[in-house]
A protein has these predicted regions:
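N-terminal Rossmann-like dinucleotide-binding module
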Residues: 1-51
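Short, well-ordered coil/turn segments that N-cap beta-strands
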Residues: 8, 31, 54, 70, ...
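Alpha-helical elements of Rossmann-like donor-binding domains used by nucleotide-donor carbohydrate transfer enzymes
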Residues: 20, 46, 62, 71, ...
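Beta-loop-alpha module in the N-terminal Rossmann-like domain of NAD(P)-dependent dehydrogenases
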Residues: 54-114
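A contiguous active-site-proximal alpha/beta segment in oxidoreductase catalytic domains
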Residues: 102-149
Length: 149
């Protein structure tokens, strides 16, 4: 469900590194930060107020079950990525998951399988790949300028 004007309605699980996701959603003209979730509810409430989120949860299952969300960011400790991502996908949400994708290959494969089954987008936040320096290094490697890598 998109809000009027077509903006994406986002929820963020984990407000440590997830605070960067919150800032991004809150500042983007086509996004609205709706909900945040963290075990540290006081910190979650403070950041929700700072970035304009309406809902604060301690349990990620409450956040992913919200009909008001289109996308969920998973920015929790690595061992929780698969569990929380799969729950969000099963709830019909697109997911942006922090790196690493998972701590075990089987978990990563299950995440991809669930995204395909749900016909939802799953993206792993490998933001350095968009960094101009990283892109230039990739081009040089592809041209063989740096020898065998």
């Amino acid at each position: 469900m998109k809000k009027s004007g077509g903006a994406l309605r986002a929820g963020v699980i984990g407000v440590g590194i997830g605070s960067h996701h919150m800032r991004g959603y809150a500042s983007h003209p086509r996004c609205e930060l709706v909900a945040v979730c963290d075990l540290n509810v006081d910190r979650a409430k403070a950041l929700a107020e700072k970035y304009g989120a309406t809902y604060v949860f301690r349990d990620y299952r409450q956040l992913v079950s919200m009909d008001e969300l289109d996308i969920v960011s998973v920015a929790t400790p690595n061992y929780l990525h698969a569990r929380m991502t799969i729950a969000a996908l099963r709830a019909g949400k697109d997911v942006l998951c922090e790196k690493p994708m998972a701590t075990r290959l089987g978990d990563a494969e299950a995440m991809v399988a669930e995204a395909r089954k749900a016909k939802k987008r799953l993206m792993i936040d490998m933001s350095y790949r968009f960094n101009p320096l990283q892109q230039e290094m990739r081009r040089r490697i592809q041209r063989g300028e740096l020898g065998e890598v």
